[in-house]
């Protein structure tokens, strides 16, 4: 069951449950599919009827009447979505924001129904314009809002670039390393950290545009950005982090630090954990992680680049891709893009030396991680750890 309020917003946001337009709560028994499947009185120019084609509504599973606002839906879900957008409505879930939406329960919670409409790809802008473009956005449509002096996006369409970033992932999606929240031992922490480092190099090797760069540029970019990529991977993989095993892995129990240095070190540990936690609270999805990692990877500040301007243009492509993706997928979270982008400077503030000491001291000893990354990248193999502690 959901309450309706004036002022359309993203289903992920909270509302106060008051109808600002002065209307009453919608009746839970009202069925939005009252109009017959063949009705055309409210047809939009962007709707595509499919007579004779048996396709289910992707929102509720009822029989669809065609393609509406980008996806196949029934007349009921089409009308509900159009009404929600045109009347600028938003809803509040009275349960846990995970209500079942099917043919029999679709009218019980408007919040979760609208949330599912967006999740399956229904387009808010298609309602506002009365039609939906069939082609992918071209270069002119891919510039970030208000951008000046930014090179237009001339690479693959935004959706294709993100698809390439997702395909570059060497492991399944978030939570891939499990852990279930249990406190891991030192060896487990180090093993998971090694796998995260492997995945960082493997992802970069298959990321769009990166393989075409000169080998020296590839090494320079990874040597500079590996710690940021590691933190992003740790957050994406939901790596279970607990202070005690981290400190043990860093060798602090065997060789205690001076008090002043230990306090500073603990502050850095907390800063690292805080960055991972903040990414978790933002509920960053896989596509956003891919874009953030690409923005971090293509840093024109890396030393010795043969063409820093080209690397900067690649970074801009990833940033534009993130802009367009967030705008399309989270249309009523206008601050989301800024919040995501602000994570990157904070990640860079986490010292690479801290990550090395926390996670890799037992595995590589005094061997610099940057040397290890260079060797893995140039050898073409990340799953053969060539170093021992010493």
UniProtKB/Swiss-Prot annotation:
Segments for region (Important for dimerization)? 314-390
Gene Ontology terms, cellular component aspect? nucleus
Which parts of the sequence are annotated with region: Disordered?
1-50
The record's gene field reads Nr2f6
The identity of this protein, by name, is Nuclear receptor subfamily 2 group F member 6
Q: What is its main location?
A: nucleus
How does the annotation summarize its subunit structure? Answer: Binds DNA as dimer; homodimer and heterodimer with NR2F2 and probably NR2F1. Interacts with THRB.
Protein family per UniProt: Belongs to the nuclear hormone receptor family. NR2 subfamily.
Give the matching PROSITE patterns.
NR_LBD, NUCLEAR_REC_DBD_1, NUCLEAR_REC_DBD_2
Record key words, sorted: DNA-binding, Metal-binding, Nucleus, Phosphoprotein, Receptor, Repressor, Transcription, Transcription regulation, Zinc, Zinc-finger
Q: What happens when the gene is disrupted?
A: Reduction of neurons in the locus coerulus of the developing cortex. Defects in circadian behavior. Hyperreactive lymphocytes, late-onset immunopathology and hypersusceptibility to Th17-dependent experimental autoimmune encephalomyelitis.
Q: Where is the composition biased (Gly residues)?
A: 1-15
């Amino acid at each position: 069951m959901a309450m309706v309020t004036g002022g359309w917003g993203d289903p992920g946001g909270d509302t106060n449950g008051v109808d600002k337009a002065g209307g009453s709560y919608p009746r839970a028994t009202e069925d939005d599919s009252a109009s017959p499947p063949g009705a055309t009185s409210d047809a939009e120019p962007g709707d595509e009827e499919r007579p004779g084609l048996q396709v289910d509504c992707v929102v509720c599973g009822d029989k669809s009447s065609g393609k509406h606002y980008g996806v196949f839906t029934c007349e009921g879900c089409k009308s509900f979505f159009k009404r929600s957008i045109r009347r600028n409505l938003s809803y509040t879930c009275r349960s846990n924001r995970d209500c079942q939406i099917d043919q029999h329960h679709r009218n019980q919670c408007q919040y979760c129904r609208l949330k599912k409409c967006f999740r399956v790809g229904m387009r808010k802008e298609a309602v506002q314009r009365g039609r939906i473009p069939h082609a992918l956005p071209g270069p002119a449509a891919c510039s970030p809002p208000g951008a000046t002096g930014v090179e237009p996006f001339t690479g693959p369409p935004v959706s294709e670039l993100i698809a390439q970033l997702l395909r570059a992932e060497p492991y399944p999606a978030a939570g891939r390393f499990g852990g279930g929240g249990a406190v891991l031992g030192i060896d487990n922490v180090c093993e998971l950290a090694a796998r995260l480092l492997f995945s960082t190099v493997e992802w970069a090797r298959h990321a769009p545009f990166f393989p075409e760069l000169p080998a020296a540029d590839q090494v320079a970019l990874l040597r500079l950005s590996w710690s940021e990529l590691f933190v992003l991977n740790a957050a994406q993989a939901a790596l279970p982090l607990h202070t005690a095993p981290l400190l043990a892995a860093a060798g602090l129990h065997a060789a205690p630090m001076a008090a002043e240095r230990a306090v500073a070190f603990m502050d850095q540990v907390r800063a690292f954990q805080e960055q991972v936690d903040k990414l978790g609270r933002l509920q960053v999805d896989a596509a956003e992680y891919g874009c953030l990692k690409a923005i971090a990877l293509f840093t024109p500040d890396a030393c010795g680049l043969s063409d820093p301007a080209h690397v900067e243009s690649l970074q801009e492509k990833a940033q534009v891709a993130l802009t367009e993706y967030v705008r399309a997928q989270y249309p009523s979270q206008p601050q989301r893009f800024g919040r995501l982008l602000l994570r990157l400077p904070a990640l860079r503030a986490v010292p690479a030396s801290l990550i090395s000491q926390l996670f890799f001291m037992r595995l590589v000893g005094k061997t610099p991680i940057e040397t290890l990354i260079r060797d893995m990248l140039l050898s073409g193999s990340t799953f053969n750890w060539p170093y021992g502690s010493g």
